[in-house]
């Protein structure tokens, strides 16, 4: 959880930095042409290629979880008689929870600027920092508190409750004030990944790699949930569309309370 929190800080700081990078590369933002997008994307492609080469050449060790070896059943007896990852209900529910979480996290990180524009607030681009600051503060708390003071499931429950409170605040407070509640919504998302991943991956044994692949595919929620949000905006408006976040956080809370404990014989 600590390592994931540290990497999360690096990841979330990039959200507000990216628009600033684009502003530096594109001189005239009032008249942006398609050709102006080539240079920043060439730079991004170059950075990714460089990182890929470095990762390929780095002597990274093969890491195995307890019981991951096919012949090793002593360390993970629960997985010994299983034949498929679909026989792990806590993993399947965890993948669904991760799908929902990534979607609602993407909402908190990517909609602040558009919401500020819809409210006709000055300098809407500056509001991109609100969710990022919330996420980073949450990650710092995770580094300090997990596992010495908070268990992973407890951290998940606390964050889900914060997310529920933030979602309600966004839709119920006056619009000009509600945009600041996106901070709470983002704070509620902060420790989800470091808390959810270990809970969903527990007791998988020889299915650890397959379970990890299933959870990774659940990241697609970051594309699906915002799309649903966009459709809701057309009918409910910029503020009302945030009702979508409430059932998402409630399901996450369910998983943190009971879902991760479910096991089959």
Label each region the model flagged:
Residues 1, 190-205:
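Intracellular juxtamembrane helix-capping segments at the cytosolic ends
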Residues 2-60:
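Helix-loop-helix hairpin linking two adjacent transmembrane segments in secondary transporters
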Residues 24-45, 154, 228-249:
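A membrane-interface helix-boundary motif in multi-pass transporters
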Residues 26, 138-152, 233:
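Helix-to-loop junctions at the C-terminal end of transmembrane segments
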Residues 50-59, 246-265:
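Multi-pass alpha-helical transporter architecture, strongest
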Residues 65-94:
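Juxtamembrane intracellular "pre-TM" segments in multi-pass secondary transporters
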Residues 83-129, 135:
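Extracytoplasmic gate region of multi-pass secondary transporters
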Residues 151-196:
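C-terminal transmembrane helical hairpin of 12-TM major facilitator-type secondary transporters
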